[in-house]
């Protein structure tokens, strides 16, 4: 089947049951098919013929998505309520006990476990 991508870009590619589709209509940052929208962006294994970059810069500053909605998408976090200023590409909700978000609106700017976190306010200190 041929699916249409969000925004003004339409995809004529159909591979594995999904089209090369941005994460959302408002903010096309990631490129992944509709059948692989559960974790981090992995178009290399889901859509080999994807024509968009894996992590495009967003056209405008957008805060990190709430947990479990569009986790793993690259988002500039300049407007997130934290001290982070870099662009990260990590899941918004970690499934481990190392660093759990305080609330669903926490920014997804958490480094791997065991490293100093620049976003200590977004993680439970008792669990990190």
Curated annotation (Swiss-Prot):
Alphabetic keyword roster: Keratin, Repeat
Statement: the UniProt record of this protein carries the keyword Repeat:
yes
Region annotated 10 X 5 AA repeats of C-C-[CDPQRWG]-[APRS]-[CIPSTVD] sits at: 5-112
Q: Which Pfam families match?
A: Keratin_B2 (PF01500), Keratin_B2_2 (PF13885)
UniProt xrefs under PANTHER family: KERATIN-ASSOCIATED PROTEIN 2-1 (PTHR48425:SF1)
What is the stated purpose of this protein?
In the hair cortex, hair keratin intermediate filaments are embedded in an interfilamentous matrix, consisting of hair keratin-associated proteins (KRTAP), which are essential for the formation of a rigid and resistant hair shaft through their extensive disulfide bond cross-linking with abundant cysteine residues of hair keratins. The matrix proteins include the high-sulfur and high-glycine-tyrosine keratins.
What is the similarity comment for this entry? Belongs to the KRTAP type 2 family.
Protein's name in the database: Keratin-associated protein 2-1
* Organism for this UniProt entry: Homo sapiens
The beginning of the lineage is: Eukaryota, Metazoa, Chordata, Craniata, Vertebrata
Q: Which gene encodes it?
A: KRTAP2-1
